[in-house]
Amino acid sequence: VQPRVVFVEPAAMTAWSNVDRSSLTELRAVIATEGHDIAGAITLTESLMHAPVPILNMSPTEVAVFIFTSGTAGSPKAAMLTHNNLHSNLVQISQENVLRNSDVVYGVLPLFHIFGLNVVLGYTLFVGATVVLVQRFDPSTALETFAERGVTVVPGAPQVWSALAQMPDDECKVLSQLR
């Protein structure tokens, strides 16, 4: 499997600089998520200004992503999920009507886990809602983001809610806008 596009965030720039790109024969673009510090890369904003890429007619049984398991029963393994696997999961989730297209979802869960990728990002886009992606959780910054961006839904691990519960009451008024 060869990547065609690679997204590189600031925290991964050192790792990316050590990759032997001569072996990436299918690579067509490197997109820097912030700044323009990577030779030959374009910014995420620049990538969105290009003409739309034609939609490919993919087989539902083709592998769409490799998601690594947590490794609780040994070493992490690459689970191959097809386009149909991902789409079926989105359809199943949408039957619960959890999100509305007017929602703004706080996306702090990692996208290299299936919940972050397909529930937080995928389902949000599937219903036409907005997702605010952040790299790291900080309770003070999160509360500011909730207020500034009008966040209405926060999928999060127990540690997120525990940290928010420790914040002073006067800073937590914005939590009343969450559903």
Report residues per predicted region.
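Structural core segment of the AMP-binding/adenylate-forming
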Residues: 1-46, 176
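Short beta-strand->loop structural element characteristic of the AMP-binding/adenylate-forming
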Residues: 1-15, 77-80, 107, 129-136
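Conserved pre-ATP/AMP-binding loop-to-beta segment of ANL
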Residues: 50-68, 75, 98-104
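Adenylate-forming
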Residues: 8-18, 137-138, 151-179
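Conserved AMP-binding/adenylation subdomain of ANL enzymes
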Residues: 87-104, 114-153, 162-163, 167-168
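Conserved AMP-binding A3 loop
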Residues: 64-88
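Short hydrophobic/charged patches on amphipathic alpha-helices used for structural packing
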Residues: 55, 67, 140-143, 170-172
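Conserved S/T- and glycine-rich ATP-binding loop of Class I adenylate-forming
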Residues: 6, 63, 69-72, 105, ...
